[in-house]
Swiss-Prot record:
Protein's organism: Pseudanabaena galeata (strain PCC 6901)
Subcellular location: Gas vesicle shell
One Pfam family from the record: Gas_vesicle
Coiled-coil regions, chain positions: none
Main location: other
GO cellular component terms, semicolon-separated: gas vesicle shell; vesicle membrane
Additional notes on this entry: Gas vesicles are 65 nm wide and between 300 and 2000 nm long in this organism.
Protein known as: Gas vesicle protein A
Function: Gas vesicles are hollow, gas filled proteinaceous nanostructures found in some microorganisms. During planktonic growth they allow positioning of the organism at a favorable depth for light or nutrient acquisition. GvpA forms the protein shell.
Length: 72
């Protein structure tokens, strides 16, 4: 995948359009411990994408119902 280098500034609408078109995944993991005792553990994966982009990639990795049904 090639990286495009653009010298002009982007508007907020262009940035949001690009994020929805390509998608972005934020993976976070937090653990709070006190004296070796785990008090809190949080794991989160946030996916930001358009429905079309999500379905395209979800089908490619087998996360949709249509991908789970074998072809007859």
């Amino acid at each position: 995948m090639a990286v495009e280098k653009v010298n002009s500034s982007s508007s907020l609408a262009e940035v949001i359009d690009r994020i929805l078109d390509k998608g972005i995944v934020i993976d976070a993991w937090v653990r709070v411990s006190l004296v070796g005792i785990e008090l809190l553990s949080i794991e989160a994966r946030v996916v930001i994408a358009s429905v079309e982009t999500y379905l395209k990639y979800a089908e490619a990795v087998g996360l949709t119902a249509s991908a789970a049904v074998p072809a007859a």
